[in-house]
Every structure is written in structure tokens, then in C-alpha cells.
Amino acid sequence: MADPLPFYIDETDPPAKREILRASLTLFAERGLAATSIRDIAEESGYTNPALYRHFPGKDELALHLFEICHARLWRVCADALASQKGFSAKLDAYVAAWLGLYDDEPAVLAFLSDSARVLWPRANATVRRNTMIGLARELVAEAPRVRARSGAVDRDAAAASIQGTLAELGRMIQVGAVAGPARRWRTKLVTLFEGLVA
């Protein structure tokens, strides 16, 4: 039985396009956009430069294609996690679990999104720019008891940035070996930390 296709590859994609997408994501995650050339992608994929140009006008369009698909997947998984639960504590746990699970299951995707957002975000389609991770974090924080009480003790934007930033930075710390993975092992500690921040 063949391995399942990564989510960023469509089952209708021809073999060359599949390998080009796989190779591109790997290289973009490992080296970054600027340090990855068309020649690198061709070499890694086993296909020629002209094969790449049959599927994408250039490296920038290929990178943007991957960025939009990967961001949409990340956002959908985390949005579904929030929607699946009732109440702040359950939503927080589901959101953290979804994010950490994605990091463990798709580390190259999260590395690519993090490293390339500054360059690709402004060029992304309107749906991607509307469906932000910080927007999901704000939605989550809006459910927190201290935020709902409107006491002013917790700033919603600062709390959302703290949650999203901590999740992203933990992934980076695991990536560079500053802390041990898997990411899922941090779930309870992070939920406790975030509850202390806003609950």
C-alpha cells in the first residue's frame, strides 16, 4: 500500500508536480526561501528545471502556493479544535493539543510558515489573510472568564499574542534542540500556563 499523500499534494497532481512540492517544502523549511534555488528544487525532486516551470511560473509562485495551502490547513485544524468544544478550558486544551499535534506531525510545514510569513503573507490570497492564527487566539481568549468579566485585568490582544507567540516559540525551541520534543509532551504545562494568564 502506498504512503498517503501529504495534505499539500492533490491526488490529481502528476508525479513531477508531487515531487516538486515535496522537495520544495523540505528545502524551504530547512534552508529558507532566499537560500533555496530552482536548481536546488530540481536536484532534490529529481526533475529538471523545465519540469518545474511546467507547473509553476517560478520559485515565488511555488512558494506562495505552498504557503497558502499550508496556512489554510493549520488554520482549519485549529479552528475545528476550537469549534469542537464548549467553555474556555475545553477550548484552550483542544487548541493547544491541535497546535502541538500539528508541530509533531508536520514540523516542516510549521517551520516553513514561520520562516516565510514576512515575505509571503502580504501576497497571500484574501481568505488566508482573513483567517489568521492570531484571530483564532483572540477568539479563544474572548472565552476566558477574566476577559468576559471585562474587568480590564487582561488585555485580549496581549493575551492572544502571548498564547500564539508561546506556541510558535516552543516549536522553534524544539526545532533547534533548546528543549526536548515531542511537542505534545508540553500540552499540560502550556494549558496550565495559559489558564493562569487569562482564566
Model-derived regions: residue spans:
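Helix-turn-helix
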Residues: 5-8, 15, 19, 23, ...
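Short coil/turn segments at alpha/beta junctions that flank glycine-rich nucleotide-binding fingerprints
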Residues: 30-34, 85, 106, 147
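Hydrophobic alpha-helical connector segments
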Residues: 65, 79-105, 159-163
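Amphipathic C-terminal alpha-helical segment
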Residues: 101-105, 109, 139, 143, ...
